[in-house]
Amino acid sequence: NPMDMNLNYSEDDSPLALKSDFILSLCELVIGGKEGLQPVDKTVIDRAVRNVYRDYLADPVPEKMPILGDLYDELLKQPEPEAARIAAALELYVSGSLNVFNHRTNVELSNRLVCFDIKQLGKQLKKLGMLIVQDQIWNRVTINRAEKKSTRYYMDEFHLLLKEEQTAAYSVEIWKRFRKWGGIPTAITQNIKDLL
Protein backbone atom coordinates (compact mmCIF):
# COMPACT_ATOMS: atom_id res chain seq x y z
CA ASN A 1 0.00 0.00 0.00
CA PRO A 2 1.75 3.19 -1.14
CA MET A 3 -0.36 5.11 1.38
CA ASP A 4 1.17 3.30 4.40
CA MET A 5 2.51 5.71 6.99
CA ASN A 6 3.48 5.43 10.64
CA LEU A 7 3.51 8.34 13.05
CA ASN A 8 7.34 8.33 13.14
CA TYR A 9 7.46 8.89 9.37
CA SER A 10 9.15 12.27 9.87
CA GLU A 11 11.14 13.94 12.60
CA ASP A 12 9.01 17.05 12.13
CA ASP A 13 5.78 17.51 14.03
CA SER A 14 3.75 16.33 11.05
CA PRO A 15 4.63 13.11 9.26
CA LEU A 16 1.90 14.07 6.81
CA ALA A 17 4.05 16.69 5.05
CA LEU A 18 6.71 14.11 4.16
CA LYS A 19 4.08 11.56 3.12
CA SER A 20 2.40 14.17 0.94
CA ASP A 21 5.76 14.79 -0.74
CA PHE A 22 6.04 11.06 -1.48
CA ILE A 23 2.50 10.96 -2.91
CA LEU A 24 3.39 13.95 -5.11
CA SER A 25 6.39 11.97 -6.44
CA LEU A 26 4.15 8.97 -7.04
CA CYS A 27 1.57 11.08 -8.91
CA GLU A 28 4.31 12.74 -10.94
CA LEU A 29 5.53 9.31 -11.99
CA VAL A 30 1.98 8.21 -12.90
CA ILE A 31 1.06 11.38 -14.79
CA GLY A 32 4.43 11.76 -16.48
CA GLY A 33 5.01 14.27 -19.24
CA LYS A 34 7.77 16.81 -19.73
CA GLU A 35 6.38 19.41 -17.35
CA GLY A 36 5.32 16.96 -14.65
CA LEU A 37 2.89 18.28 -12.07
CA GLN A 38 1.83 21.90 -12.28
CA PRO A 39 1.46 24.05 -9.12
CA VAL A 40 -2.34 23.65 -9.12
CA ASP A 41 -1.95 19.87 -9.50
CA LYS A 42 0.34 19.78 -6.47
CA THR A 43 -2.06 21.88 -4.41
CA VAL A 44 -5.01 19.64 -5.28
CA ILE A 45 -3.06 16.45 -4.50
CA ASP A 46 -1.76 17.85 -1.21
CA ARG A 47 -5.27 18.84 -0.12
CA ALA A 48 -6.64 15.40 -1.04
CA VAL A 49 -3.80 13.68 0.84
CA ARG A 50 -4.48 15.73 3.97
CA ASN A 51 -8.18 14.86 3.74
CA VAL A 52 -7.71 11.10 3.31
CA TYR A 53 -5.35 10.85 6.29
CA ARG A 54 -7.61 12.82 8.64
CA ASP A 55 -9.37 9.75 10.12
CA TYR A 56 -6.14 7.75 10.40
CA LEU A 57 -4.28 10.55 12.19
CA ALA A 58 -7.18 10.99 14.63
CA ASP A 59 -7.11 7.26 15.45
CA PRO A 60 -3.99 5.57 13.98
CA VAL A 61 -5.15 1.97 13.67
CA PRO A 62 -4.31 -0.13 10.59
CA GLU A 63 -7.97 -0.41 9.55
CA LYS A 64 -8.09 3.36 9.02
CA MET A 65 -4.99 3.50 6.82
CA PRO A 66 -6.08 4.91 3.46
CA ILE A 67 -5.40 3.13 0.18
CA LEU A 68 -4.83 4.58 -3.28
CA GLY A 69 -8.56 4.26 -4.03
CA ASP A 70 -9.33 6.62 -1.15
CA LEU A 71 -7.05 9.24 -2.70
CA TYR A 72 -8.74 8.69 -6.07
CA ASP A 73 -12.20 9.17 -4.52
CA GLU A 74 -11.06 12.31 -2.70
CA LEU A 75 -9.63 13.77 -5.90
CA LEU A 76 -13.00 13.26 -7.60
CA LYS A 77 -14.63 15.36 -4.85
CA GLN A 78 -12.36 18.35 -5.54
CA PRO A 79 -13.84 21.21 -7.61
CA GLU A 80 -10.79 21.90 -9.82
CA PRO A 81 -10.69 20.32 -13.31
CA GLU A 82 -7.07 19.35 -12.59
CA ALA A 83 -8.33 17.01 -9.87
CA ALA A 84 -10.45 15.10 -12.38
CA ARG A 85 -7.45 14.83 -14.72
CA ILE A 86 -5.22 13.50 -11.93
CA ALA A 87 -7.91 11.03 -10.84
CA ALA A 88 -8.26 9.84 -14.45
CA ALA A 89 -4.50 9.18 -14.55
CA LEU A 90 -4.71 7.21 -11.28
CA GLU A 91 -7.73 5.16 -12.39
CA LEU A 92 -5.55 2.57 -14.14
CA TYR A 93 -3.81 1.94 -10.79
CA VAL A 94 -7.00 2.01 -8.71
CA SER A 95 -9.61 0.04 -10.64
CA GLY A 96 -7.81 -0.78 -13.89
CA SER A 97 -5.58 -3.68 -14.84
CA LEU A 98 -2.61 -2.28 -12.86
CA ASN A 99 -4.39 -2.07 -9.49
CA VAL A 100 -1.89 -4.27 -7.62
CA PHE A 101 -0.98 -1.44 -5.22
CA ASN A 102 -4.58 -0.46 -4.39
CA HIS A 103 -4.79 -2.80 -1.41
CA ARG A 104 -3.67 -2.91 2.19
CA THR A 105 -0.10 -4.09 2.66
CA ASN A 106 0.08 -7.88 2.86
CA VAL A 107 3.84 -8.19 3.39
CA GLU A 108 5.13 -8.88 6.90
CA LEU A 109 7.62 -6.06 7.25
CA SER A 110 8.64 -6.77 10.84
CA ASN A 111 10.74 -9.82 9.91
CA ARG A 112 14.48 -9.47 10.39
CA LEU A 113 15.04 -10.00 6.66
CA VAL A 114 12.62 -8.79 3.99
CA CYS A 115 13.28 -9.13 0.27
CA PHE A 116 11.29 -7.10 -2.25
CA ASP A 117 11.41 -8.64 -5.72
CA ILE A 118 9.93 -6.39 -8.37
CA LYS A 119 11.12 -8.45 -11.34
CA GLN A 120 7.63 -9.76 -12.15
CA LEU A 121 5.89 -6.38 -12.01
CA GLY A 122 6.26 -5.70 -15.71
CA LYS A 123 7.31 -2.56 -17.51
CA GLN A 124 4.29 -0.42 -16.58
CA LEU A 125 4.52 -1.08 -12.83
CA LYS A 126 8.27 -1.40 -12.29
CA LYS A 127 9.06 2.31 -11.77
CA LEU A 128 6.07 2.73 -9.49
CA GLY A 129 7.05 -0.44 -7.64
CA MET A 130 10.61 0.82 -7.06
CA LEU A 131 9.29 4.06 -5.59
CA ILE A 132 6.79 2.26 -3.33
CA VAL A 133 9.40 -0.24 -2.10
CA GLN A 134 11.69 2.61 -1.04
CA ASP A 135 8.83 4.23 0.83
CA GLN A 136 7.99 0.94 2.59
CA ILE A 137 11.61 0.62 3.63
CA TRP A 138 11.55 4.21 4.89
CA ASN A 139 8.59 3.24 7.09
CA ARG A 140 10.71 0.39 8.50
CA VAL A 141 13.70 2.71 9.09
CA THR A 142 11.51 5.07 11.12
CA ILE A 143 10.10 2.24 13.23
CA ASN A 144 13.57 0.78 13.82
CA ARG A 145 14.99 4.19 14.75
CA ALA A 146 12.34 4.55 17.45
CA GLU A 147 13.44 1.11 18.74
CA LYS A 148 17.15 2.13 18.55
CA LYS A 149 17.88 -0.38 15.75
CA SER A 150 19.80 0.09 12.52
CA THR A 151 18.24 -0.91 9.20
CA ARG A 152 20.41 -2.33 6.44
CA TYR A 153 19.11 -1.70 2.94
CA TYR A 154 20.72 -3.47 -0.02
CA MET A 155 19.63 -2.22 -3.44
CA ASP A 156 20.64 -4.55 -6.25
CA GLU A 157 20.57 -3.22 -9.83
CA PHE A 158 20.73 0.29 -8.36
CA HIS A 159 21.25 1.82 -11.79
CA LEU A 160 17.59 1.05 -12.56
CA LEU A 161 16.54 3.50 -9.85
CA LEU A 162 18.59 6.20 -11.53
CA LYS A 163 17.07 5.82 -15.02
CA GLU A 164 13.93 7.85 -14.35
CA GLU A 165 14.05 11.41 -13.04
CA GLN A 166 11.44 10.84 -10.31
CA THR A 167 12.93 7.60 -8.95
CA ALA A 168 16.46 9.03 -9.18
CA ALA A 169 15.54 12.17 -7.24
CA TYR A 170 13.66 10.16 -4.62
CA SER A 171 16.54 7.67 -4.34
CA VAL A 172 19.08 10.42 -3.64
CA GLU A 173 16.77 12.07 -1.11
CA ILE A 174 15.93 8.84 0.71
CA TRP A 175 19.60 7.74 0.73
CA LYS A 176 20.48 10.89 2.68
CA ARG A 177 17.51 10.46 5.02
CA PHE A 178 18.39 6.79 5.66
CA ARG A 179 21.90 7.73 6.78
CA LYS A 180 20.60 10.47 9.06
CA TRP A 181 18.09 8.10 10.66
CA GLY A 182 20.52 5.23 11.32
CA GLY A 183 19.89 3.33 8.11
CA ILE A 184 22.75 1.65 6.31
CA PRO A 185 22.01 1.77 2.57
CA THR A 186 24.19 -0.16 0.12
CA ALA A 187 23.88 0.21 -3.65
CA ILE A 188 24.86 -2.69 -5.89
CA THR A 189 25.45 -2.34 -9.61
CA GLN A 190 27.55 -4.20 -12.17
CA ASN A 191 29.15 -1.12 -13.66
CA ILE A 192 30.34 1.83 -11.59
CA LYS A 193 29.96 4.22 -14.53
CA ASP A 194 26.18 3.91 -14.06
CA LEU A 195 26.63 6.06 -10.97
CA LEU A 196 28.89 8.72 -12.49
What are these regions (language model features)?
Residues L195-L196:
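Short, glycine/polar-rich helix-capping loops at beta-to-alpha or helix-loop-helix junctions
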Residues N191-I192:
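The feature captures the ABC ATPase H-loop/switch
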Residues P2-G183, A187:
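P-loop NTPase motor domains
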